[in-house]
């Protein structure tokens, strides 16, 4: 049985989606909302996303908070210190989560996109993620560990 692709979404993708629902980021968020893509989150990544979104008017946390479904929460510890190749300590949390659950990290951050081989995770932009034919391939998603 095929499962929806499993992803971790970086904060900048949520911000882009909230500003332009017709963007690649907006389409990706809609895939999550419709169950075509499974978004895994951690308390730390949710806190960062919420803090950033709430600081940027006119976007609204209420427009994305429903995507943080309890059944998709990864509640084990993550180790951002293993990802010191990423300059921004806040971005390391997203890389650590993607690594811990075997998910694709979707980001528009050049620091994350520029070093996936050193992170040992797949990092894609929303456009790159949407251009892959996940639903027709043999790829079946990665269950949470």
Task: State the predicted function of each range.
Residues 10-11, 42, 108-109, 125:
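A secondary-structure boundary/capping signal
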Residues 1-6, 126:
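Small, basic N-terminal interaction modules of short regulatory proteins
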Residues 8-9, 19, 24-54:
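PIN/NYN-family metal-dependent endoribonuclease catalytic core
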Residues 43-44, 62-85:
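Acidic catalytic patch
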Residues 31, 97, 115:
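Hydrophobic/aromatic ligand-binding patch that stacks against planar heteroaromatic rings
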Residues 36, 99-102, 120:
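Residue-level detector of structured alpha->beta connecting loops
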Residues 88-105:
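Acidic, metal-associated active-site segment
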Residues 84-88, 92, 110-145:
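Acidic, PIN/NYN-like endoribonuclease modules and their adjacent C-terminal/linker elements
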């Amino acid at each position: 049985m095929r499962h929806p692709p499993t992803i971790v979404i970086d904060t900048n993708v949520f911000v882009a989606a909230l500003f332009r629902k017709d963007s690649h980021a907006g389409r990706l968020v809609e895939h999550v909302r419709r169950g075509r893509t499974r978004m895994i989150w951690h308390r730390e990544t949710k806190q960062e996303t919420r803090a950033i979104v709430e600081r940027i008017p006119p976007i609204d946390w209420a427009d994305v908070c429903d995507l943080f479904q309890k059944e998709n929460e990864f509640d084990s510890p993550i180790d951002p210190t293993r990802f010191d190749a990423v300059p921004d300590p806040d971005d390391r949390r997203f890389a650590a989560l993607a690594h811990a659950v075997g998910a694709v990290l979707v980001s528009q951050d050049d620091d994350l996109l520029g070093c996936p081989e050193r992170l040992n995770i797949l990092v894609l932009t929303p456009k790159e993620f949407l251009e892959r034919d996940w639903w027709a391939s043999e790829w079946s998603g990665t269950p949470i560990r």
